[in-house]
């Protein structure tokens, strides 16, 4: 299912304003030229009007940010997000599958949904990263990624108020790395394969 030249799949999960700030910080430190598909989940109410794509595009000018379309094959060097009522998950051909999140049926479980999908469908060429938040969403998904042979990372809260999200991770499976955004980006730069000169469109 996964050839050695297939891109890795990296998924970030966070919640709240601190989580958004951490996403922006990590995306601005994102290593250039890595052969990896990048997906981001931030907790949002399903009935919200969301400007997340515009915010990320403005604050992270070095990355192209897209709202994934159902069935779209995701490619490296693009940051993909879902919609508030259609959270992003991934199929085994690296195409987006936007699941039904209307009426908040997946409220505070959208990170786990994405993490579980990459663990099940991609396997060992995956990285799950949990950033700031006050909930445990992502902990079960990280455990699934670990069982599939992927890498699991957690943001070190440093001097920030410690959220339950990071605390819960320790109870659900080993973590590959804990660090700040810059350190996580440096580890990814060393671990992920480099992209060939072929341009993806």
Model-identified regions with their sequence ranges:
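Conserved acid/base catalytic micro-environments in cytosolic active-site loops
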Residues: 1-201
